[in-house]
């Protein structure tokens, strides 16, 4: 898994309309509200659209399996739920992934993990994938309610997940050694932000 700083994030006005022309045959994962905003901007329609309702494992897999396999790409359109769902679909279908966030206050944009939840507890990982790139279209993001783009929760969650990714990667022998003192100081800083 690459770190957030290495993600290819492309910003601009009308970037979805321009960028989607190169997608070939693709499937999309979205939510009804996000799809309503982005669908009219797409260069050509997907071969299938999976609507995300929640992050329940059986729902994610059922939607994934209902989509065609003979495509070139998976595109996640929306906020955290749909972006995470798209990661699972791309992993299960062994396809590249492009993410199109409709809000920017979510860490799902830059983290390739999809947690497996049991109630309110993470019990495992459903998918791990790095996306090819992220398209942040200013016109799309501006259509979201202001509180969804200014909440800041995504920043805090990214900070926390960065610590856990560092710990996890160090255990796997990837990246720099985990330093408990630095991690504790960073975690305290994030706690102070929330307090």
Where are these regions (language model features)?
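Short Gly/Thr/Asp-enriched flexible loops that form oxyanion-binding sites at enzyme active sites
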Residues: 82-95
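ATP/NTP phosphate-donor binding region
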Residues: 1-73
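Oxyanion-binding "anion nests"
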Residues: 188-195
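Residue-level detector of flexible, active-site-proximal loop/helix-junction positions
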Residues: 53-56, 81, 104
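A glycine/threonine-rich phosphate-anchoring loop and its flanking beta-alpha core
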Residues: 92-187
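Short beta-strand/turn micro-motifs composed of small residues
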Residues: 29-30, 78, 101
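Short glycine-/acidic-enriched loop or helix-start segments at secondary-structure transitions
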Residues: 37-40, 85-87, 109-110, 145
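Gly/Ser-rich catalytic serine loop of serine hydrolases
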Residues: 74-83
